[in-house]
């Protein structure tokens, strides 16, 4: 794969954020590129890394033909981890998903783990290892996207994955999903740190307007979230920046070493919260001993602009408003946010009709890092008590 080399970067403490890199050519063999402004990641190295990367697909009541396309596009070497929060009664959409996965496995013999987010055996495993952050007042796992991603991470850790990538299940273009996973691998191969995150910036996010396709560059929420994440950095460096373009990147990946030390917020705030936490904790040289290896190696964040556009399910204006509120709430409540920044966020949310005059954004609910969870014990409990766990080739 040929990509623009990461020339410009923003350094914030131990955190390096690379400017967005465009994919120039999807598939290459030779390692020799005479131009220093281009990075070449040979096909063989990408395919070697894919075998060490689990791809996590959280889903909830998605269209089955979209799920089918997404699964078929994930490179065969990658273990697939599906965490579903779909209905199990009236109608039982989860059963339909299970039937689809079984058929997909029979055709492909892909490596797959599947589980339902509301599985009582899964909740029991969290309870017994003392990790109750993910549970609701009834002792069941909450319904948020962040919770599903965290379950997927633990399953990935249990099977020994060194890298984890996330893809949404509602993508209309299967070929785009195939590219996303290879983009993740390319990002990891460019990194010099074991604590690396790769976030994707869609080349276009097309919308149907007046009967034709309009290839929009920015999503509605992303534009605003990125603006405030950049302000968060700028107000501490005193230099204006536009480096961050992937604040709401649902399609992102990280090394397991980074994933297991990050706390995760719930629901749709999870992607911007990852960035906010990394900047808060590793953007200053404080309490270095707790994470000495992280500070020694540094955290690298790569942003890659995809070759493919991103078509996904339109979930309506209310979904957009909820995403915007939860995304900006993570920045509003950050320890790095200044009074001036908070005032601007409040004004924006009120101007969009999302908050009333005297309301504040809700404080994000945060779940502890998974590093201290005894993974073998947790997995043994899941396997012994789950009613929905399916394992194929894993």
Curated annotation (Swiss-Prot):
Main location: cytoplasm
Entry's EC annotation: 2.4.1.217
Recorded catalytic activity of this chain's protein: (2R)-3-phosphoglycerate + GDP-alpha-D-mannose = 2-O-(alpha-D-mannosyl)-3-phosphoglycerate + GDP + H(+)
Main enzyme class: transferase
Family: Belongs to the glycosyltransferase 2 family.
NCBIfam families on file: osmo_MPGsynth (TIGR02460)
Protein name: Mannosyl-3-phosphoglycerate synthase
Source lineage: Archaea, Methanobacteriati, Methanobacteriota, Thermococci, Thermococcales
